[in-house]
Design a protein with these regions (language model features):
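Short, surface-exposed amphipathic charged segments that create phosphate/polyanion-binding patches used
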Residues: 182-198
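Conserved S-adenosyl-L-methionine
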Residues: 22-182
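A short N-terminal interaction module
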Residues: 1-13, 17-26
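Disulfide-bonded cysteines in secreted/extracellular proteins and peptides
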Residues: 70, 188, 209-212
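Helix N-cap and loop-to-helix transition residues
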Residues: 6-7, 131, 237
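Long, low-complexity, polar/charged, intrinsically disordered or flexibly structured peripheral segments
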Residues: 194-247
């Protein structure tokens, strides 16, 4: 199956729509533009982001964002154009995480608090992907996003322990999953049951995975995916988060 790449400007337009609703105001981070050659792009708003009454930047950092079938996770971070492969400067990035980090950079100066809220930002974004190669690239992009933003802010590389902490969060929040089954891809199997009659004749009976047979995500015999509930500091099955369980 071929990978489908959503152009970065479409990702930006859709994320802008989400932020327009959250802020109650349009085009706070950037505005869509059409270049002379007909290419659709965006122009970054360089002014500090202002928050509406009743909300603040910490609320924005904590707000959960989730990219399904994320591929290389262009909605989470936009280090490069999805169709051009051109590197995008930090100030012009448009992903969910990019915007959260921008807000942190605008409101935090001290390293300790920057790391604290950056960790929270990483814990607030989620994504799953069927294909392992795309998942690897997505995780890599998120980790590089942390390193690049840290260097941009403090003009030095982050400590290994800080990189490892973010890498651990990424390993939980971006995972490999069959989104229709909520299990690790291709982990469901048919079982063989052998029955023997009184004459010692044996018959092999193939038993299908009931979840696959009945298209019920709660009945699969594959390996169910787990994610981390960071507030409770415990793991939970992703399938248990679905509504109307068992219906």
């Amino acid at each position: 199956m071929a990978e489908i790449y959503t152009p970065s400007w479409i990702c930006n337009a859709q994320i802008n729509s989400i932020d327009n609703g959250w802020f109650g105001k349009e085009n706070l981070f950037n505005i869509q533009v059409t270049l002379k050659d007909g290419t659709v792009s965006w122009k970054t708003n360089d002014k500090k982001i202002k928050f509406p009454k009743g909300k603040n930047w910490k609320d924005y950092i904590a707000d959960i964002r989730f990219e399904v079938t994320c591929g290389e996770a262009p909605y989470l971070t936009s280090r490069y154009g999805t169709t051009t492969w051109e590197y995008i400067q930090i100030k012009n990035r448009i992903g969910f995480l990019d915007r959260k980090l921008r807000v942190i950079n605008e409101n935090i100066k001290k390293r300790y608090y920057w790391l604290k809220y950056t960790e929270q930002a990483f814990k607030s974004i989620y994504g799953y992907e069927f294909h392992g190669d795309s998942l690897l690239l997505a995780r890599e992009s998120l980790l590089y996003t942390f390193i690049e933003n840290y260097y941009e802010k403090f003009l030095e590389e982050p400590k290994l322990e800080d990189i490892q902490n973010i890498a651990n969060i990424i390993s939980w929040n971006l995972w490999q999953m069959d989104g229709l089954k909520c299990v690790i891809p291709n982990s469901c199997t048919d079982k063989i049951r052998i029955e023997q009659d009184i004459f010692d004749n044996t018959t092999k009976i193939n038993i299908e995975c009931q979840g696959c047979k009945k298209n019920n995500p709660y009945l699969h015999n594959g390996i169910y995916c787990t994610i981390m509930d960071w507030e409770e500091n415990k793991t939970i099955k992703f399938v248990d988060m679905l509504e109307n369980k068992g219906n």
